[in-house]
Amino acid sequence: MSVRILVVDDDRAVRESLRRSLSFNGYTVELAHDGVEALEMIASDRPDALVLDVMMPRLDGLEVCRQLRSTGDDLPILVLTARDSVSERVAGLDAGADDYLPKPFALEELLARMRALLRRTKLEDDEAADSVAMTFSDLSLDPVTREVTRGARRISLTRTEFALLEMLIANPRRVLTRSRILEEVWGFDFPTSGNALEVYVGYLRRKTEAEGEPRLIHTVRGVGYVLRETPP
């Protein structure tokens, strides 16, 4: 059975372009023109993934993310943001989106990101049952319940943030190269240009240091990142 993707965008040309491209690549595609219609369709027949524009009438993409996440729905979500709007990307990740893609975008990149997102989702399902909670310092991550805590404080992470932190905590005090992280978290076909990794590391730091806790995720300049108690 093919993967079902719901594309939500108020621009008909964008919807049709994505429908053609995704269908050609073997996906079953459904379309919605705004957030209200999208939530109704998800409630009646849940898709496997969601491609979601941010700026839409009636109900925007950020509110769709928030409403889905508030009910505990972990539907994989790729949001489409304005090209130069850093604040929009920030808001999308904070609302619970798993990944973002700035407009205008190459269809090849959207397909690559969707493949990577679906791979991460499948790996979660396949591996969670065999996993045990992992800890480093006062940071704890449970792959089964998907709970993350720093001390007594619970931390809410998106799917991509969780996958990145899981990789770091599974390799404590070991420097992970940028290319290795991109390959394992995003997939081999993820475009290595751009600053997606840096964006996600920034968000992990913000969330894990929200109450003034010492930094655990450190940059190794020119190489990658490492999880350790003190800077390298």
From Swiss-Prot:
Signal peptide: none annotated. Keywords: Cytoplasm, DNA-binding, Phosphoprotein, Stress response, Transcription, Transcription regulation, Two-component regulatory system, Virulence. The keyword Transcription regulation applies. The keyword DNA-binding applies. Pfam families: Response_reg, Trans_reg_C. GO terms for molecular function: phosphorelay response regulator activity; transcription cis-regulatory region binding. GO terms for biological process: regulation of DNA-templated transcription. Phosphorylated and dephosphorylated by MprB. SUPFAM superfamilies: CheY-like (SSF52172). InterPro entries: CheY-like_superfamily, OmpR/PhoB-type_DNA-bd, Sig_transdc_resp-reg_receiver, WalR-like, WH-like_DNA-bd_sf. It is found in: Cytoplasm. One of its GO terms (cellular component) is cytosol. Residues 4-118 form the Response regulatory domain. The modification 4-aspartylphosphate is found at residue 48. Residues 131-229 bind DNA. Member of the two-component regulatory system MprB/MprA which contributes to maintaining a balance among several systems involved in stress resistance and is required for establishment and maintenance of persistent infection in the host. Functions as a transcriptional regulator that recognizes a 19-bp nucleotide motif comprizing two loosely conserved 8-bp direct DNA-binding motif repeats separated by a 3-bp spacer region. PANTHER family: REGULATOR OF RPOS. This is Response regulator MprA. It comes from Mycobacterium ulcerans (strain Agy99).
